[in-house]
Amino acid sequence: MSKFWSPVVRALEPYVPGEQPQIDGLIKLNTNESPYPPSPKVLELMTHDAIDRLRLYPDPDSKKLKATIASYHNISPEQVFVGNGSDEVLGLLFMAFFQQGKAVLFPDITYSFYPVYCKLFNIDYRTVPLNDNFDIDFNDYPQDNSGIIFPNPNAPTAIGKPLAEIEALLQRNSETVVVVDEAYIDFGGQTAIALIGKYPNLLVVQTLSKSRALAGMRVGFAAGHKDLIAGLDRVKNSFNSYPLDRLAEAAAVVAFEDDSYFKRCCNKVIATRDYTVRELEKLGYQVLPSQANFVFAAPPAGNAAEIAQYLRDHKILVRYFNKPRINQFLRITIGTDEQMQKMIEVLQQY
């Protein structure tokens, strides 16, 4: 701690990401990355000409990527905002929309970056407990708020919400912004982007880190009414006028264009997830219903921390959260068939 730190910095409890260890032969199932490489067309971008152009600043408006995303989702480019990963997009929207004098609402068990943003930007917040089934119950969300944000599917529980329930929430909360954080939507959920033309207070955030395998490029975006997007642009341009580097933007464009590769990879992850759920349940694990590229599973003896260490000793890394209500669960990213078979074999020997 430095004497030069501001009171805000002194009070912060930064987000702690999953480990990125450099261990030979490690099966890494702890940060929900794709087990498959990006589209082969991404590699084709890495030409001498592309590298040479890195000496030039990128397009500050990311017009080509916005147009690509808009075309993919049948919306207008002015309804799209892009940023350096969805975490940056989320941070900017907290600043843009949630400093309204009332509490912003989000689940008590959810993405742990949300309270970090609130403390950083001095935003009042209130967490709403998940129900006994670890599901979000929108009936528990009061209308007196400065905004609502939740992941769909939720993280780390992996449980998704149907569009009908999201639309009902929007109808009850027409005076504040509702943010649907769709980092894992491509593994079985239905995106709410189709609703942005109907609800001017809806903002949908997605990332290319999971289903499109570009975690190392840091690309995220938001879709919403053009006035919400304009607000995000105002905040972004007060920090950094160049949101994406040239290679990241080009890679993101082709990741959307190669739709057949994207769908094949998603389908493989879903099939492997179904296999993993079946095998874990055979071992007596409680596995919450998943619409994500991971499962949230509780071992029968309730010894999740011990199992996490046991797997680590066998060079298999999963995520354990030492937090109330979920400290008997493991979050397990879906890897390749071979990786998940290996994990099951190791668990069978426990």
From Swiss-Prot:
Its cofactor is pyridoxal 5'-phosphate. Keywords: Amino-acid biosynthesis, Aminotransferase, Histidine biosynthesis, Pyridoxal phosphate, Transferase. Pfam families: Aminotran_1_2. GO terms for molecular function: histidinol-phosphate transaminase activity; pyridoxal phosphate binding. The keyword Translocase does not apply. The modification N6-(pyridoxal phosphate)lysine is found at K210. Pathway: Amino-acid biosynthesis; L-histidine biosynthesis; L-histidine from 5-phospho-alpha-D-ribose 1-diphosphate: step 7/9. CDD domains: AAT_like. GO terms for biological process: L-histidine biosynthetic process. PROSITE patterns: AA_TRANSFER_CLASS_2. Coiled coil: none annotated. Its EC number is 2.6.1.9. It comes from the Bacteria. Belongs to the class-II pyridoxal-phosphate-dependent aminotransferase family. Histidinol-phosphate aminotransferase subfamily. Homodimer. HAMAP family: HisC_aminotrans_2 (MF_01023). NCBIfam families: hisC. PANTHER family: HISTIDINOL-PHOSPHATE AMINOTRANSFERASE, HISTIDINOL-PHOSPHATE AMINOTRANSFERASE 2. This is Histidinol-phosphate aminotransferase.
